[in-house]
């Protein structure tokens, strides 16, 4: 009987030493993990929706045909590096402003006029998130470039009209070029076909901040229908020709975003520069 009592006491001691200790350790680990999750930024995840884009209420009508088979505008490329490693959008805007007669440089545009925000506070359609001087920043969408351009032109006392042409066909953009207006156009880096919608955070207003991985911005300034090419001022490459069909596909992958800066006399009848609506591009998440 004494032996059984001793064995029972020994078993109880083993339980207290190992099982209670392990349970306490597990509890501490769980609590630590919980604290970490509460303070960690939301991860980048594949977004399964589409991004609503703001565009003009009345878009230019797609032309039945282009007035010329070949057009080359004398737009000069502006390179984003080394000063603006993630500033392709504001660099393309700078090239467009230079063409319109404004001798502004990309750094001035980035530092004084580009609408910027810290992460977590806004979406990429409302501000450039991060700093274009930082290689780890993100970028922005067409509405940000529209407002940035409008602010700059107003500060200079100019009367050029800035229009968001998001949703227009590439043929419509080529019509703009044929009529003397280069187009700030979103495409992809090196025309890669790999594009992903990535969710990063939800803003205080409840909007999802979703960025298109590999998005890029160029200034469309020419085309050659016979060679099936478009000419762009690429902030990474300079003035280059790209295959027209491939460029059109990449333009569609990033929701057909485009912006023009032009004289009011070049606006088509019925166009407006003030009213906006929200459209949902019919592009599935990659």
Question: Predicted segment positions?
Answer:
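A mature extracytoplasmic/lumenal domain signature
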Residues: 92, 166, 187-191, 222-224, ...
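Loop/turn elements at helix/coil->beta-strand transitions in domains of secreted/extracellular proteins
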Residues: 156-160, 179-184, 227-228, 256
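Short linear loop/turn motifs
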Residues: 110-114, 165-171
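...with weaker cross-activation on analogous glycine-rich loops/strands in unrelated enzymes
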Residues: 151, 155, 167-186, 192
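Active-site-adjacent structural segments surrounding the nucleophilic cysteine of cysteine proteases
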Residues: 2-5, 10-151, 155, 189-191, ...
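Short loop/edge segments at beta-strand edges and connector loops
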Residues: 73-75, 164-167
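Structural recognition of the beta-strand scaffold that forms the well-ordered cores
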Residues: 87, 162, 182-186, 219, ...
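Noncatalytic regulatory segments and standalone regulatory/sensor domains
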Residues: 199-212, 218-286
């Amino acid at each position: 009987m004494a032996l059984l009592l001793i064995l029972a006491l020994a078993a109880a001691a083993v339980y207290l030493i190992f099982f209670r200790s392990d349970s306490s350790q597990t509890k501490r680990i769980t609590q630590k993990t919980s604290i970490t999750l509460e303070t960690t930024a939301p991860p980048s995840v594949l977004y399964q929706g589409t991004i609503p884009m703001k565009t003009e209420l009345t878009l230019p009508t797609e032309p039945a045909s282009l007035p010329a088979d070949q057009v080359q505008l004398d737009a000069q490329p502006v390179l984003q590096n080394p000063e603006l490693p993630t500033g392709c959008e504001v660099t393309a805007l700078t090239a467009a402003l230079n063409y319109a007669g404004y001798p502004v440089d990309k750094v001035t545009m980035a530092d004084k006029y580009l609408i910027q925000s810290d992460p977590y506070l806004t979406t990429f359609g409302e501000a450039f998130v991060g700093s274009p001087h930082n290689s780890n920043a993100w970028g922005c969408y067409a509405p940000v470039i529209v407002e940035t351009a409008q602010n700059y032109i107003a500060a200079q006392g100019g009367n050029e009209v800035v229009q968001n042409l998001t949703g227009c066909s590439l043929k419509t953009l080529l019509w703009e070029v044929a009529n003397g207006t280069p187009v700030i156009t979103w495409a992809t880096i090196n025309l890669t076909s790999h594009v992903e919608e990535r969710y990063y955070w939800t803003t205080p207003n409840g909007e999802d901040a979703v960025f298109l991985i590999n998005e890029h911005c160029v200034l469309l300034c020419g085309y050659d229908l016979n060679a099936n090419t478009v000419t762009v001022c690429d902030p990474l490459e300079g003035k280059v020709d790209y295959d027209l069909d491939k460029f059109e596909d990449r333009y569609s992958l990033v929701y057909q975003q485009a912006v023009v800066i032009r004289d009011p006399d070049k606006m088509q009848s019925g166009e407006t520069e003030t009213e906006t609506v929200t459209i949902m591009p019919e592009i599935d998440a990659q």
